Amino acid sequence: MGSPRAALLMLLLRPIKLLRRRFRLLLLLAVVSVGLWTLYLELVASAQAGGNPLNHRYGSWRELAKALASRNIPAVDPNLQFYRPQRLSLKDQEIARSRSRNSSYLKWNKPVPWLSEFRGHANLHVFEDWCGSSIQQLRNNLHFPLYPHIRTTLRKLAVSPKWTNYGLRIFGYLHPFTDGKIQFAIAADDNAEFWLSRDDQVSGLQLLASVGKTGKEWTAPGEFGKFQSQISKPVSLSASLRYYFEVLHKQNDEGTDHVEVAWRRNDPGAKFTIIDSPFLSLFTNETILRMDEVGHIPQTAASHVGSSNTPPRDEQPPADMLRPDPRDTLFRVPLIAKSHLRHVLPDCPYKPSYLVDGLPLQRYQGLRFVHLSFVYPNDYTRLSHMETHNKCFYQESAYDQDRSSFQEYIKMDKPEKHGPEQPAGLEDGLLEESQYEDVPEEIPTSQDQNTGIQGRKQKTISTPGLGVTDYHLRKLLARSQSGPVAPLSKQNSTTAFPTRTSNIPVQRPEKSPVPSRDLSHSDQGARRNLPLIQRARPTGDRPGKTLEQSQWLNQVESFIAEQRRGDRIEPPTPSRGWRPEEDVVIAADQEGEVEEEEEGEDEEEDMSEVFEYVPMFDPVVNWGQTFSAQNLDFQALRTDWIDLNCNTSGNLLLPEQEALEVTRVFLRKLSQRTRGRYQLQRIVNVEKRQDRLRGGRYFLELELLDGQRLVRLSEYVSTRGWRGGDHPGREDTEARNLQGLVWSPRNRHRHVLNAQDPEPKLCWPQGFSWNHRAVVHFIVPVKNQARWVQQFIRDMESLSQVTGDAHFSIIITDYSSEDMDVEMALKRSRLRSYQYLKLSGNFERSAGLQAGIDLVKDPHSIIFLCDLHIHFPAGIIDTIRKHCVEGKMAFAPMVMRLHCGATPQWPEGYWEVNGFGLLGIYKSDLDKIGGMNTKEFRDRWGGEDWELLDRILQAGLEVERLSLRNFFHHFHSKRGMWNRRQMKMP
């Protein structure tokens, strides 16, 4: 072995030997590294200087090659880019959609390239078939601002499409015609707003001019000085810059639709001129973009300010249905274990008496065999906020549907004694007897009278149009009886009021025509100030007039005649412009004869005398009048048959006593079986299907406490032979009394006389149990409905997020939509489960639904035949499962159709009582009845739901029918739908 020094030297020389052997390889690596570093530095420098032609944007490689090959290209801006409409990434589009309804629009700042080719036009977005007159109503539109019906352009800021119920959003850039101060003005019918930015950025937008806010304001075309807000303050602009602007316009169904924006120099005498094409440019080119591509649409203060249509917290909801209810969130509470309920009740056969089960039905006759269910507690599906326009809930005739018709339900209290200011006498006899007595029975009337009041009780109130006249005449008579006017005191005797025993109208003798004379200014003034007494029409002209009213009016006429005859007053002769058929001074003698007025010089004096002596009276109001009234519950008048004449009633209400009795018996059985393990927390919902022969079926939904854990019970129970509401009691007696008031004897409720047990005997109906794990498939056929498809997908995403339910899926059958890529929209959504099927040809709803049904392979899953324009409550999936029972029952929820301009936050509309297009049914049951009728309903629809209903009932299935809270059908435009073609109007 060598010395240690020699060994150390060998170790140091070994790396040198290795480097010498690999020197060439190391040298090559060093050269490559230096070259790459040099290239990197060169690229960075060229990018900063803008000199690299590869750094430019060209439409294609061919354009790039031409640019590199050309030797004669003059020097241009090195940052020049060839324009191609930008398709933002899916992520950006999703962000744009999520921000469409909140204040994050302030962060919207998408750099959209601008080209000189954009000059001459502005972007125009049209929102069709949306009622209202205010800009706020436009912002409340579900699709505003991202999903308009039409995207087009405009050549000048003056548009009048001659259409109704629409909204416009015009946006782009303004190029000022000069430097300096400029004023803007806007005119429109109805409301409109003009917004302008400080520069070309959308973030600096400010409101400069407007026409109203409430929807009641409008102007004529070119009328810029009607409202103070129409003309803006002077704004400093530069002709070398461009400025982003927006115009919002809302038009209702009245007037001449127009909106125009004008400008002028801030000089004395300068006139406004409409902004024309040389001073406009597009914000972006939308020609090749699909309707579902919305990332380029600017979201600004103009499009979003005040856009939330949710009422403030301190404001009451416009409909009681919008108030919080435990039913709305019950789906979040876990279900009680089935094993704990198995032996709580005995099993019993279930076959209700109202099933059709094979009986032959005529076409569309099944609607008559659908029964409504009762609910407890009140779910406030009655549209009470709509009863100003529709009072059908009170079961009054169309003639009597006014507030005065409720007079028969109150009984006026008799005054104990007369005060000094209200002496006893004729006024009591007339007013009290005719106005406050009990409702009289029908009396014989003339043929004309019977046409207006046939089949109704005679009311003591005055009919529309008669009340004012009768009331003032009545007070005139009463005031005259007490003798406030001295010249008439001599005539205060009962002999002046002969009673008439018939309803024959008073015959007035014809007056001979007298040439009219020109009145002096004083006479004309007296004539204008004359308090005229309206002539009462003959009895036959006013339907519904009672005998007392007819007699009383005749007495008034005779009384006035006595007054004039005693003072030698003759009636004036009608002159030009004074029609005797209208307001005249009534005059008649006791025998009903009137002497003709003599022509001559005394005519004007007689007329002046008439004007001078006509008395004026103020009506006496009895502010201390009290009355008595009984409890009224008009729900007692309703039956479980579908009422096609009333679409605001909502669900039938189950009597509280009955619901509590069934719940009490069930909880007692549950406590006995589980040894008191569960305690009742709250009765959330009880539904009853009435069966008068075999006992009703109840659906109990209870919140129970299992120790400290909250669980829910949602189960069907049956009562054998117990009918619930048929037992006698105080509430039932009041209901029969109310029926006697409103119904005619032949239409009164027939009471079942069979005796029944005081306590219900509960049991589990065999085979009638719902599956809480069943998969629900929402099937929707579509064609060219991009904005609604996007909304439907967003609603389904929201349901998935809120409920966390993994057992539902959506199926969209698409008839080759051209306005969006439906399949791509589904792929980029957050839906867990979906299916897409592309079809061809014209839109056919039945065929589209059947194609979606065929995609479902599991026969034990639920098919929900759906519509595209639906707003779903959060618990819709759980509700569909609970009301679909395989082999037993289908579910047809009743949807509320919103009026034009209404929203789910401000719902105005009606229940779709006769529509069954929204239907939940098990796949096995639907296959059993043959599915959709695709042969008969091809190019037409409307009736396919009733035809399907006929087959469901004939198969022995029940159809559950309930009005669902917060279940809305959006109002939508029908233009372009259902294979409709457009026709150019002259």
Swiss-Prot record:
Taken from the UniProt entry, a GO cellular component term is: Golgi cisterna membrane
**What InterPro entries is this protein classified in?**
Chond_GalNAc, CS_glycosyltransferase, Nucleotide-diphossugar_trans, PA14/GLEYA, PA14_dom
EC no.? Answer: 2.4.1.244
Tell where it localizes.
Answer: Golgi apparatus, Golgi stack membrane
The transmembrane residues are 25-45
Which UniProt keywords are listed? Glycosyltransferase, Golgi apparatus, Membrane, Signal-anchor, Transferase, Transmembrane, Transmembrane helix
Query: What reaction does this enzyme carry out catalytically?
Result: an N-acetyl-beta-D-glucosaminyl derivative + UDP-N-acetyl-alpha-D-galactosamine = an N-acetyl-beta-D-galactosaminyl-(1->4)-N-acetyl-beta-D-glucosaminyl derivative + UDP + H(+)
**Residue span of region Disordered:** 301-324, 434-466, 481-552
What GO molecular function annotations does the UniProt record carry, in alphabetical order? Answer: acetylgalactosaminyltransferase activity; glucuronosyl-N-acetylgalactosaminyl-proteoglycan 4-beta-N-acetylgalactosaminyltransferase activity; N-acetyl-beta-glucosaminyl-derivative 4-beta-N-acetylgalactosaminyltransferase activity
Q: How does it sit in the membrane?
A: Single-pass type II membrane protein
This protein is called: Beta-1,4-N-acetylgalactosaminyltransferase 3
Organism, scientific name: Mus musculus
